[in-house]
Curated annotation (Swiss-Prot):
Enzyme class: transferase
UniProt keyword list: 4Fe-4S, Cytoplasm, Disulfide bond, Iron, Iron-sulfur, Metal-binding, Methyltransferase, rRNA processing, S-adenosyl-L-methionine, Transferase, tRNA processing
Signal sequence extent: none
Name listed for the protein in its UniProt record: Probable dual-specificity RNA methyltransferase RlmN
Primary gene name: rlmN
Biological source species: Clostridium beijerinckii (strain ATCC 51743 / NCIMB 8052) (Clostridium acetobutylicum)
One Pfam family here: Radical_SAM
Length: 353
C-alpha cells in the first residue's frame, strides 16, 4: 500500500496511466485530499471502479494526535503526534498577526548530537517520509480549522540528513494542487551538512535557509556540535556564500546563547567580524534549559550586549521571542517527556518486569 501524500501530481498521473486510467484523475484525487476529503468513497466525481483500485493500492496517512498542549502565556500549541509504527514526533503551532506558523519535524529523533538539544539525546530512530512531513501540517490545519501560512523545518531531526524526502516535501507543499504555501514562507534549518547545502543551492528555491552556527570558532563549535568535527566553519561559510549567490536569498544564522559558553562580548565581536559583509541575519536564541545537561541560558543583559555588538558590526540581528515556554515547546522536549512518563507508568504497572 502506498501513502498518497508521498506522491507528486506527476507521479500520480503516471500511476493512473500505467493502470489504465485517465491521467486527469490524479488531479481530481489530490484536489479532494487537499480539500480535506480523505475517504475515497466520498470523492464524488471518481468512478466506483477507480475508487476500488484506490482502496486496494493507496491510503492517506495521517498521524494520530496523542496530546495537545496549549500555552497559557501566548497561545502556542504543541502537538504530540503518533504514527502507526508507534513512533512519536512533535509539531508546534505558533500564532502571529501575519498568520499561523508551524514548526515541523523531519526525523524521529536526530543523529546530530548537539549538546543543548533534547531531540538528539537518544539518537535518530528513522527518517520521516515525504507524506509524514506533509501530514503534520494537514492534521494541525484540520484540528484548528484555520489555514497555516508559514512553515519552519526546525523541529526534531536534521532536514538535510533526510534530503530527498525533504526536497520532495518542498515541491508538494508549495504546489497549487496541494497546500499552496509559498516557498518564501518556508524556512529550512540545518546544522551545516556542507555537500547538501550546495545541492540545495543548485535547486534555486525561494525558501529561507537557517544555519545553526552557535559559535565563532571551530574549537568552540566542536564542544557543543559534533557536526563541527566533519565540517569547519570556513567550509560552512563558503557553502553559504555559494547559496546566497545562487538564490539571491539572505541566510539566517542561528546562535543559541549559552551562559559562560558562547555569550561573551569577545564571542560577539568575533562573530561580527566573521559575518561582516555577508547577506545575512543573525537570530539570537536564548537556549532552552533541559535536565539532561547543565547548560544555562544567558542573562538578559548578556543577550542585549551581544545583540548590540553585532549591530555595531553592521549585522542585522533579532532575538527570538520565546514561545510556549510553559509547555516544553522546544524541539524534542515533549516527546522525551511523554516517553519517560509512559516508561515510569509501565514500570509501576509491572509491564516491564
Amino acid at each position: 500500500m502506498n501513502n498518497l501524500l508521498d506522491f507528486t501530481l506527476e507521479e500520480l498521473k503516471a500511476w493512473m496511466k500505467e493502470n489504465g486510467e485517465s491521467a486527469f484523475r490524479g488531479q481530481q484525487i489530490l484536489s479532494w485530499i487537499y480539500k480535506g476529503v480523505k475517504e475515497f468513497d466520498n470523492m464524488k466525481n471518481i468512478p466506483k471502479p477507480l475508487v476500488q483500485k484506490l482502496k486496494e493500492n493507496f491510503f492517506v496517512g495521517l498521524p494520530k494526535i496523542i496530546e495537545v498542549y496549549k500555552s497559557n502565556i501566548d497561545g502556542t500549541e504543541k502537538f504530540l503526534l503518533g504514527f502507526k509504527d508507534g513512533n512519536l514526533i512533535e509539531s508546534v503551532l505558533m500564532r502571529y498577526k501575519h498568520g499561523n506558523s508551524i514548526c515541523i519535524s523531519t526525523q524521529v529523533g536526530c543523529a546530530m548530537g548537539c549538546k543543548f538539544c533534547a531531540s538528539t539525546i537518544e539518537g535518530k530512530v528513522r527518517n520521516l517520509t515525504t507524506g509524514e512531513i506533509l501530514s503534520q501540517i494537514m492534521v494541525v490545519q484540520d484540528y484548528i480549522n484555520e489555514r497555516i501560512s508559514n512553515v519552519v523545518l526546525m523541529g526534531s531531526g536534521e532536514p538535510l540528513d533526510n534530503y530527498n524526502n525533504v526536497i520532495k516535501f518542498l515541491e508538494i507543499v508549495s504546489a497549487e494542487y496541494a497546500l499552496n504555501i509559498g516557498q518564501r514562507h518556508i524556512t529550512l534549518s540545518t546544522c551545516g551538512i556542507v555537500p547538501k547545502i550546495y545541492e540545495l543551492a543548485d535547486k534555486e528555491l525561494s525558501i529561507t535557509l537557517a544555519l545553526s552556527l552557535h559559535a565563532f570558532s571551530n574549537d568552540k563549535r566542536k564542544e557543543i556540535m559534533p557536526i563541527a568535527n566533519r565540517y569547519s566553519i570556513e567550509e560552512i561559510l563558503e557553502a553559504c556564500r555559494y547559496y546566497i549567490n545562487k538564490t539571491n536569498r539572505r541566510i539566517t544564522f542561528e546562535y543559541a546563547l549559552v551562559k559562560d559558553v558562547n555569550d561573551g562580548r569577545e564571542d560577539a565581536k568575533a562573530l561580527g567580524k566573521l559575518l561582516k559583509g555577508m547577506l545575512c541575519h543573525v537570530n539570537l536564541i536564548p537556549v532552552n534549559e533541559i535536565k539532561e545537561n547543565t547548560y544555562k541560558r544567558s542573562s538578559k543583559k548578556a543577550i542585549e550586549d551581544f545583540s548590540e555588538i553585532l549591530k555595531n558590526h553592521g549585522i542585522e540581528v533579532t532575538t527570538r521571542r520565546e514561545m510556549g515556554s510553559d509547555i516544553n515547546a522546544a524541539c524534542g522536549q515533549l516527546r522525551r517527556s511523554y516517553i519517560n512518563t509512559q516508561e515510569i507508568e509501565g514500570e509501576q504497572n509491572g509491564r516491564f518486569s
